Amino acid sequence: MNISNENTMQLRPHQLEALDKMNTKRLGQIIVPTGGGKTMCMIEDAKRQFKSPVSKTIVVVAPRILLANQLSSEFLEHITNVAVAHVHSGETHHFSTTNSIDLTHWDSINPHHNKLIFTTYHSLHKIQNSMVDVDTIYFDEAHNSVQKNFYPATEHFSRNADRCYFFTA
């Protein structure tokens, strides 16, 4: 995996503390004020995970399509040489689907690649139905994760993903 040195941000103490906790706990809440660098915590953690000799699949969940696309752009400023999928109904130049079978197929043709999947809370159940093995999942604006329609998929990934983190302000 190539990790871009461009736009490398010096992490602040609270971000380093969050990353240290993420290294030792498989499940947790990361509470950082708006503008405090939650996205950079996710990106830095993903970079660490992608250094593993075994390929990893990381899912990033956002409340809106626009934010999912924005997070994708931010991640890809710092992480390259990964397979990227979007699971939502919005437009993107990456592979995109809302069909669980298509996502399963995409996953199967990228067995040796690190993978980033960007989705919304509305479409998270599509990833659950695809049976893609998720190593790490980041829930952005995590207060959305407990809404009645979203909770079953949230609960599934909090129990079944190797690592699960809820980011909120």
Describe the function of each predicted region.
Residues T24-I30, S55-T57, N114-K115:
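Pre-Walker A (Motif I) flank of P-loop NTPase domains
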Residues M1-I31:
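Conserved pre-motif I regulatory segment
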Residues M22, C41-Q49, L71, A153:
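Hydrophobic residues on the short alpha-helix immediately C-terminal to a glycine-rich phosphate/catalytic loop
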Residues K25-D45:
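Walker A/P-loop
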Residues L66-S100:
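Conserved helix-turn-beta segment of the N-terminal RecA-like "Helicase ATP-binding" lobe
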Residues I109-I127:
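Conserved two-lobed SF2 helicase motor
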Residues Y121-L124, N129-F166:
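SF2 helicase catalytic motif II
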Residues T39-E44, V54-E77:
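Conserved Walker A/P-loop ATP-binding site and its immediately adjacent core
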